[in-house]
UniProtKB/Swiss-Prot annotation:
CDD domains: DnaJ, DnaJ_C, DnaJ_zf. SMART domains: DnaJ. One of its GO terms (molecular function) is unfolded protein binding. This is Chaperone protein DnaJ. HAMAP family: DnaJ (MF_01152). Its cofactor is Zn(2+). The J domain is necessary and sufficient to stimulate DnaK ATPase activity. Zinc center 1 plays an important role in the autonomous, DnaK-independent chaperone activity of DnaJ. Zinc center 2 is essential for interaction with DnaK and for DnaJ activity. A zinc finger (CR-type) spans 131-213. GO terms for biological process: chaperone cofactor-dependent protein refolding; DNA replication; protein refolding; response to heat. Its main location: cytoplasm. It is found in: Cytoplasm. One of its GO terms (cellular component) is cytoplasm. Zn(2+) 2 binds at C161, C164, C187, C190.
Amino acid sequence: MGKRDYYEILGIDKSASQDEIKKNYRKLARKYHPDVNKEADAAEKFKEVKEAYEVLSDDQKRAQYDQFGHSGPQSQGFGGFGGGAQDFGGFGDIFDMFFGGGGRSRDPNAPQQGNDLQYTMILDFEEAVFGKETDIEIPKEESCDTCNGSGAKPGTKPETCSHCHGSGQLNQEQNTPFGRVVNRRVCNYCQGTGKIIPDKCNTCGGSGTVQKNKKIHISIPAGIDEGQQIRVAGKGESGKNGGPAGDLFVVIKVRPHDFFVREGDHIFCELPLTYAQAALGDELEVPTVHGKVKVKVPAGTQTGKTFRIKGKGAPNVRGRGHGDQHIKIKVMTPTNLSEKQKDLLREFNELGGNESTDEQDDNIFQRFRRAFKGE
């Protein structure tokens, strides 16, 4: 099966701008990244997207691809395929050969950045609103203290692999209709490291790393919300060959509150009123995350009426002020009435106490919706 067209892979037209190429690449790279997408073919699709972007994001490579496609320029001044063996460095490096890479191999001993780590932290409602300072312990791969990360028993050292001579790759020559081709593959004797460890460290078993519980201090900013994450630079797994450490990403989960509901920076709650309070009006103390606040409820207040207390919501996590607290009224229907109370209600009903305006009936559901939209 032939290779797919690069423009098709990225879902763009041949006239696409560099901004469009970059935008579609980022979207697809996030979609198929093996750390996010666990489907069996995700890694292959991610590699395919990356390869397409590497060519189309480079104006020179893109022009050559538009002219020659996957077959390459062949005899158009690039040396062709005939004659001596051409070193392609494996199929993944074919475009390096065509577009200036010259079949360069990767140095197995080059510094490599460590893996990123993810930690899920569960906060109480108030902790998310006000923030906190805390320490967490996470298991992470650290350089082995016994062998200083070499993987070799103290007093010994790794040796250069005699099969790949330290390159980490083996060359396999094949005869093709185009001539002899050298295909590179990872050295199976040293697993691509370029080193052999005759005497392995007893502590780490030759890996050069051990798992340790590491205490890390985390500053939770005020106003953080469910699903947001905090990046702690350099607190991921250790790098290899002197490379930098990865990062730690702390993903936030927030426990539900019994009384408050949060939407963005705004906080919502429901305030129960008796018939008498709703009809006659009242002044009540209402709880907020910042303390109690007095609210005047005017006479004739209906279920669904909302009041806003400005600035009593959650602080914006980026420091852009505070949200508001929205209070939705709920008039409670009594369920356990004494005979005297029932008689009084019947008398009230006979005096015309059951009259209500059409406007009140029509708008009650509109007010309910507005309350949850923060209007």
